[in-house]
Regions:
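C-terminal alpha-helical "lid" subdomain
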Residues: 1-30, 34-49, 53, 214, ...
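Conserved adenine-nucleotide phosphate-binding loops and their immediately adjacent elements
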Residues: 60-73
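Pre-Walker A adenine-sensing motif
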Residues: 71-88
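Conserved AAA+ ATPase "SRH/arginine-finger" region at the nucleotide-binding site
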Residues: 121-125, 204-209, 220-232
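Mid-core helix/loop region of P-loop NTP-binding domains shared across ATPases and GTPases
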Residues: 128-129, 134, 143-187, 192, ...
Length: 297
């Protein structure tokens, strides 16, 4: 079977377009089109190599189990969900904070997926008070035109007495003015607000010298999920992705190598699972430890 035929069959089976293949090759769509038809007049050998590599890579992907992170009910995630639920029911501002990679985002996304009256904003370092208002307007189906006061008033009018919940992930990225904007919306509209982020979120809410009393005094509950997850949580998450993690030695190796971090655990599980699928060897504690040596974080 020619490489062109193999590539055509792969594209048909996977539903890949010539544009997608061209992007993977780093070539133009015209080159891929001509190559597939056997009409390419350039360096056919170099395109053959690209095709071979692409086909082999796709074959490796097919061998590998598709492992994706998903929400798993654990002791920590249940605590987080309860703090969110209380903010929703009581119209309070609650906070969830802790180290990166412990599942805060997953908890918020799960709550949003289960409650259609919950709004989720995922902030980044470029977020200003105006960006927060524009994002909220987008979620509420409101116009993003107008000055900040007009946008704020529009959001308050849409949310007042609605019983809705506003959640902001990575809220440590928000400057003081953005946090104050959220406080004002909470006060005026009477909705619950959940802020989730790294530990410095608490400092941002209090102020370095405790000068933001008006803001921090609004916080009802603040859940600190710490620097790492307990072994039971790591075990539950690991087994949900990799049945071999039920073996005591493999489970123990994953916990130790993950440092109690769910994000690092996912990288470990994906790596050892892929190696197992491709090599044909069973997942072992030794394989976990060996792969862990290659992880930077």
């Amino acid at each position: 079977m020619s490489l062109q035929t193999e590539l055509n069959e792969l594209m048909s089976r996977k539903g890949y377009s010539q544009t997608q293949v061209a992007r993977a090759f780093g070539k133009s769509t015209a080159v891929v089109n001509q190559y597939l038809q056997g009409k390419y007049k350039g360096d056919v050998g170099s395109i053959d190599e690209l095709a071979r590599s692409f086909i082999a890579r796709e074959a490796d992907k097919e061998k590998s189990r598709r492992i994706t992170p998903r929400y798993i009910p654990t002791v920590t995630s249940r605590k987080g969900s309860e703090v969110i639920r209380l903010a929703h029911l009581d119209g309070e501002i609650n906070v969830i904070y802790g180290a990166a990679g412990l599942g805060k985002t997953m908890i918020l996304r799960e709550y949003a997926s289960q409650h259609r009256d919950a709004l989720l904003i995922e902030a980044d370092p470029g977020y200003t008070a105006r960006v927060v208002l524009e994002e909220l307007c987008g979620l509420l189906g409101l116009s993003k035109r107008g000055n900040m006061h007009e946008l704020s008033e529009a959001c308050i009018a849409a949310l007042r007495d609605s019983g809705r919940l506003l959640m902001v992930d990575e809220a440590e990225n928000l400057p003081y003015r953005a946090l104050e904007t959220l406080r004002r919306i909470h006060d005026k509209a009477g909705i619950g607000v959940v802020l989730a982020g790294m530990p410095r979120l608490i400092i941002n809410l209090k102020g370095k010298r405790g000068e933001y009393q008006q803001l921090f005094s609004r916080v009802g509950l603040a859940l600190n999920i710490g620097e790492s997850l307990p072994q039971g949580d790591i075990s539950d998450i690991a087994v949900s992705m990799l049945p071999d993690a039920e073996k005591p030695d493999v489970g123990e190796a994953l916990f130790r190598a993950s440092n109690g971090n769910a994000r690092r655990l996912f990288k470990l599980v994906r790596g050892v699972s892929r190696h197992s699928d491709i090599s044909g060897n069973a997942v072992s504690a030794g394989a976990v430890r060996k792969f862990a040596e290659m992880l930077i974080n």
